């Protein structure tokens, strides 16, 4: 899937592997299968533990992992791998259960929040008049989960301020997702005679 959170996790994992670290990823499966496998992401091989999931009808690619037994499955992976830290990407399903499993094994947990409740509403089945209430509930739930982290980050300072205000958390670190600017550098000399507009927005 092409989205900011997925690309962030992919680049971070790939960068850690290239620096010699052992990285394990826990993520929903693309189909109804499950279990560990070797996958190539960001140009490197890594172990991905896939969780059984189901397609969300109102989204082209989003899959919803089965919650039944998820904590136990994640706990089994953590017990076998014994990571130095667990890094979750949201307070929702996988992140929530990973936190529970990690805490029981006294592992450090870091979270990078990518979730914006406003962006979830367009894929919900709720009537529009309920969206403000739903967003308030999601933010409150996010705060309840994210306050349990050993460290909490977001990609930008503005996102950190928003998270602290909306989810009532503190000490959020703004750490950029990082972009390899050399991949986008233009080797052809240019001038400013023709105006160029660049739009940066969501693909979905």
What label would you give each PLM region?
Residues 153, 189-204:
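Conserved donor-binding/catalytic core segment of Leloir-type glycosyltransferases
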Residues 104, 116-117, 132-151, 166:
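Membrane-proximal helix-turn-helix segments that form the acceptor-binding/catalytic region
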Residues 85, 102-123, 153:
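Active-site proximal beta-strand in glycosyltransferases
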Residues 74-95, 99, 105-110:
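Short N-terminal targeting/anchoring amphipathic segment
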Residues 1-52:
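N-terminal subdomain of nucleotide-sugar transferases
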Residues 176-185:
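Short beta-strand->alpha-helix junction loop in the catalytic core
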Residues 55-59, 111-140:
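Acceptor-binding helix/loop patch of EC 2.4 sugar-transfer enzymes
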Residues 29, 158, 178:
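Carbohydrate-associated surface elements
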